[in-house]
Regions:
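N-terminal beta1-alpha1-beta2 submodule of the flavodoxin-like/Rossmannoid cofactor-binding fold
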Residues: 1-113, 159-206
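Short, glycine-/small-residue-rich phosphate/pyrophosphate-handling segment
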Residues: 97, 112-159
């Protein structure tokens, strides 16, 4: 059991094990070491995750998704966690196609129980090769997902991490992320708020 009683899931939406992989694991390490959270990690790297085809099996049968792939493992992790970190590289000003597919496939969970993710707390980390590389629009799309699923999105507050953690990799992978002191400070700031809000929710839940 963690010191906080909080289980935190980090999801890397990058097909590579570079900047996003590093940033998520750095955030999880910080949450574990600073706050005593229990952590779990999932990466889309080398995973088979099919697109949602809008077949409506999940709507008709209320038995989850008809596809049997890596999402089966992730669904379980998502449901068990109290809080999530969704992280993505920026592709064309938005989250990666791989992460978008993960989010689309969550329709099957909502079809069975539309409150399944209710009151879980979520944050975003988006990594761009440029300093102004589309991180904030990408973070906004993650916030939208959280709101649609009755989750509670958090940022780091004004002056530094408004919508979440925007990180600049300079297209240098993990080394670029490590070098972005401002970006990693934002990661820590948002994790602090994530843990704080998760504790508040747990304390007030009937």
């Amino acid at each position: 059991m963690s010191k906080t009683g909080i289980t935190l899931l980090g999801i890397s939406g990058s097909p590579r094990l570079k900047s996003t992989h590093y940033a998520v694991n750095a955030a999880l390490d910080y949450a574990r070491e600073r706050h005593g959270a229990e952590t779990d990690y999932f990466s889309v790297h080398a995973k088979t995750i099919g697109f949602c085809t809008h077949c409506d099996f999940c709507i008709r049968k209320k038995q989850g998704c008809i596809q049997d792939d890596a999402m089966s493992e992730l669904y379980e992790k998502m449901l068990l966690a109290d809080a999530w970190i969704l992280a993505s590289p920026v592709y064309q000003g938005q989250v990666s196609g791989q992460l978008k597919t993960v989010l689309d496939r969550c329709r099957a969970v909502a079809a069975r129980d539309r409150h399944a993710f209710r009151d879980k707390v979520g944050m975003g980390i988006c990594i761009g090769g440029d300093r102004s590389g589309g991180q904030e629009p990408s973070l906004q799309s993650l916030i939208g997902f959280y709101l649609i699923n009755e989750m509670i999105p958090v940022g780091g507050g004004a002056f530094g991490a408004n919508l979440g953690a925007a990180v600049w990799s300079r297209d240098k992978g993990a080394e670029g992320v490590k070098a972005d002191e401002e970006g990693m400070a934002a990661v820590h700031r948002v994790v602090d708020r994530l843990i704080e809000m998760t504790r508040l929710v747990a304390g007030r839940r009937p």
